[in-house]
Amino acid sequence: LDSVRERLLVAIDELPDDALLAPNTIGNWSVADLLVQQTAWESELVTGLKQVSEGQKPARLLAALANREEYGRLRYEENQGRDLDRIFDDLPQVRMQVEEWLEEFTEKQLSQKGLYPWLSGQSLAQLIARVTYEQELRTLPLVEAVVRKWQAPPDDLMISLTPKLGEDEATDSAN
């Protein structure tokens, strides 16, 4: 959990606010939108883990996983225009809640496949991985590409020290 999150935070550390908020940098979304999405998923996971600990099926989490695109669209609509300070406050707070809930389960409860019938043979740890670090790993290369693009100097600011083809002829004929 921690190493992937750290890679994500290191990647975006150098980005200014306008780069984080720039629309359409990753598909139709901004980097900030992706961070909000991750927080929303992990918040849903916290609710789901609470339900599991109470012996209940985490129906909303399972429905979200069954239709990730729709869940993402709804969370995007709910959180559009969210303040960056709030985003960066919520991201670690929700992750801490996930980690606290992990401590509530035994190793067997986390790792045994088939223990929870509604997971279709998966372990609880596999579900947690899908929602947390596996999701971050899928988006990390996209975020890193935005960072590289944002940090790269624009080509049009480069001044060529060698004449372009045809420039010699223009200066020669002017003499």
Enumerate the language-model features and the residues they cover:
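Long, hydrophobic N-terminal alpha-helical segment
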Residues: 1-33
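Catalytic cores of transferase enzymes with a strong primary signal for eukaryotic protein kinases
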Residues: 1-14, 45, 50-58, 83
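Alpha-helical packing segments of well-folded alpha/beta enzyme cores
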Residues: 4-8, 41, 45, 83, ...
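Acidic/histidine-rich alpha-helical segments that form the ligand environment
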Residues: 67-112, 130
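Short, contiguous alpha-helical
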Residues: 21-70, 110-175
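A generic structural signal for well-ordered alpha-helical segments enriched in polar/charged residues
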Residues: 10, 14, 47, 93-100, ...
